[in-house]
Amino acid sequence: IPTKQKNMANYYSDHPEIAFHLNHPLMERIVELKEKNYEDKAKFEDAPVDYNDAIENYKQILDITGDVAANIIEPNSESVDLEGPHLENGRMIYASKTFENLDATRKAGLHGVSMPRRYGGLNLPNTVFSMLSEVISAADAGYQNIWSLQSCIDTLYEFGSEEQRQKYIPRVCAGETMSMDLTEPDAGSDLQRVMLKATYDEKEGCWRLNGVKRFITNGDSDIHLVLAR
């Protein structure tokens, strides 16, 4: 990622209204809950020691994101639209500049941002994640869609086993992409009608899926969160 030059655009600092969220009256309580009273400060060098330290950390991350958004993602956006993705051996391949965007956000450490530090994440509150998402969306709403689907990992963190967490969360924090596989031909917003069935294969130690998913955003992702019966 290039060193920020004087007068370069920044989609965070150029839009001070985004920072308003950091001044919300409930923000201090939100940070305390997310940081569990700052217990990580004894284990991780980059963990905040108090509320003010956490806010400064968030501002730095937002500033880095604003720099990447304005000076890499936005300049790539027209090329991404013109080239578009394509099929290759049955696999959807991103436009070349989308790969550049992914490389930039990976190098900036902007993946798995809401996950705990022990898995390689930044332990950011959802408020800050939403601010990052807004900054990236200002540069390219299409790439924001790809990037923000990392939030699917929150479901696994909340409901998955520790074995699953150890297996998948570090991969997302390292920049692997995700998708949320919900929609079917006869089940869109009415998810009670989902028919795809998951059956555990004890011999192979894996789940077998029988059914159809359709219109899956970022459906070529590395990791899929699948809703099944």
State each model region's role.
Residues S148-L149, G160-W207:
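Internal maturation/activation junctions in enzymes
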Residues C206, N210-R229:
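A short core secondary-structure module
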Residues L102, M195-T199, F215:
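Short, surface-exposed charged micro-motifs
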Residues L33-Y38, N76-H86, M115-R117, Q144-L149, ...:
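Short coil/turn segments at secondary-structure boundaries
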Residues K4-E88, M92:
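Extended, charge-enriched "interface" segments that sit outside catalytic cores
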Residues G66-D67, S96-A174, T217-G219:
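Internal helix-loop-helix
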Residues G90-I93, G120-G121, D186-S189:
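Conserved, non-catalytic sequence blocks in retroelement Pol enzymes and Pol-derived host proteins
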